[in-house]
Regions:
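A short, structured beta-strand-centered segment in the mid-to-C-terminal lobe
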Residues: 1-5
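C-terminal cap/loop subdomain of S1 sulfatases and analogous C-terminal strand-loop tails that border
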Residues: 6-9, 14-92, 110, 122-128
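Intrinsic disorder/low-complexity segments
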Residues: 45, 104, 114-117, 124
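A short acidic/glycine-rich loop-to-helix N-cap element
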Residues: 100-106
Length: 128
C-alpha cells in the first residue's frame, strides 16, 4: 500500500481512540492494518532537495515525486524559478530498483502528461 509520513499522526490518533480534525492531509492507515490488501490512497508524494544542504541553506534543485502502485514519476525543478530541469519515470512492476528511466520514451509521454498534472495538483497545489 502507498503510505506517507504524514499518515502516521492520523493512524496513531485512531489507534489511541483520539479525535482528529477533518483538515489533516494524512490518512489513517488503520484500514491497511486490518486488511493489508486494502488501499487508503491512490498516490504518495515525496520531495527531495539537491544538493541536500544542512539546515539554513537553499537547495539548487528540488525533486517532486508522485508514486502510484505501478510508477514513480519525478520532476527535478530549479528551486529559484520552478523550471523543470529533468524528469524520471520508473515502472515498479518491472523495475523495482529504478535502474531504467523511461521518461524519454515516446510511448510513455501520455502517461507522463497525466502524472505531471496530478503531481501539480497534489504536490504543487496548482490547477490545470
Amino acid at each position: 500500500a502507498l503510505v506517507e509520513l504524514l499518515d502516521l499522526y492520523p493512524t496513531l490518533t485512531e489507534l489511541c481512540g483520539l479525535k482528529t480534525t477533518d483538515d489533516l492531509q494524512g490518512k489513517s492507515l488503520v484500514p491497511i492494518l486490518e486488511k493489508p490488501d486494502q488501499t487508503v490512497k491512490e498516490v504518495a508524494i515525496t520531495q527531495t532537495p539537491r544538493p541536500n544542504y544542512p539546515r539554513g541553506k537553499t537547495p539548487q534543485i528540488m525533486g517532486y515525486s508522485i508514486r502510484t502502485e505501478q510508477y514513480r514519476y519525478t520532476e527535478w525543478r530549479n528551486f529559484s524559478n520552478g523550471d523543470v530541469k529533468a524528469r524520471d519515470l520508473y515502472d515498479h512492476t518491472y523495475d523495482p530498483d529504478e535502474m531504467t528511466n523511461l521518461a524519454k520514451r515516446r510511448d510513455k509521454q501520455s502517461l507522463i502528461a497525466g502524472l505531471a498534472i496530478k503531481l501539480e495538483q497534489t504536490a504543487l497545489k496548482t490547477k490545470r
